[in-house]
């Protein structure tokens, strides 16, 4: 994260209207970050869960135009639901990621549990590339 991004996170439910504001806020120094989504049981109801969706999005927005809040819990759910590699997904989003939203889950429900020792996400959290990225703890 070397672009000095300030962050405003949000869910992409209103993706079309939300993305349209990305062109105006630069004048007011407002930067936009979209939170990655993910659900196992309701996977057909959410946008921006699969790599192909981000490939389409990135045709219109550069890392200077739009940031990504990578929700680790949602990534666990989406990768299970749609059978894709978490590591490849993070690599694809890496230039856009300005924040990591951190919680643990069982891969079926978004439980917002505290992080656990030795789990898959630590290599992402400890990646030097994300040293300056915001870390958001989402525990219940």
Summary of predicted features, one role per range:
Residues 5-6, 44-52, 74-136, 140:
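Gly/Pro-rich active-site loop or hairpin
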Residues 71:
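Active-site glycine-centered loops adjacent to acidic/histidine catalytic or metal-binding residues
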Residues 1-67, 77:
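Active-site acidic/histidine proton-transfer and metal-coordination neighborhood
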């Amino acid at each position: 994260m070397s672009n000095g991004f300030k962050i405003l996170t949000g869910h992409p439910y209103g993706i079309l209207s939300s993305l349209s504001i990305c062109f105006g806020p630069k004048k007011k120094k407002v930067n936009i970050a979209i939170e990655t989504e993910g659900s196992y049981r309701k996977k057909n109801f959410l946008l921006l869960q699969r790599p192909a969706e981000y490939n389409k999005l990135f045709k219109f927005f550069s890392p200077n135009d739009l940031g990504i809040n990578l929700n680790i819990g949602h990534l666990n759910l989406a990768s299970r639901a749609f059978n894709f590699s978490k590591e490849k997904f993070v690599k694809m989003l890496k230039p856009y990621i300005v924040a990591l939203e951190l919680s643990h889950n069982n891969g079926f429900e978004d439980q917002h549990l505290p992080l656990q020792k030795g789990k898959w996400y630590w290599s992402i959290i400890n990646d030097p590339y994300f040293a300056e990225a915001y870390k958001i703890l989402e525990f219940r």
